[in-house]
Amino acid sequence: MSQLNDISLVAQVVVFKNTRAFDQLVKEYQSPIRRFFLNLTCGDSELSDDLAQDTFIKAYTNIASFRNLSSFSTWLYRIAYNVFYDYIRSRKEKIGRAHV
């Protein structure tokens, strides 16, 4: 998908609350985001699916904050990275509490 098309779809989601436009973005980026998580989770497909879902939920919730300072994919991957970082941090906290 071209960056121009991504911007158009983002605008439709923000201005018109067009969920079908967001569905198109999900279709385009679902596989790459899932592969990103598969690499980070050593192939754990269930966890990768959960993290990808969290990424798209956060992207939809915060799509109005997309400022087109970078490509939509860069913005989405930053969200994905943050979702993974939050997951790792929560796991460390759970492990730390279990050993207390």
Give residue spans per PLM region.
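N-terminal module of bacterial RNA polymerase sigma factors
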Residues: M1-P32
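Short, charged helix-capping/linker segments at alpha-helix termini
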Residues: V14-Q24, R35-D54
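Sigma70-family region 2
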Residues: V15, C42-G43, F56-S71, R91-K92
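Arg/Lys-rich amphipathic alpha helix in sigma70-family domain 2
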Residues: S65-R67, Y81-R97
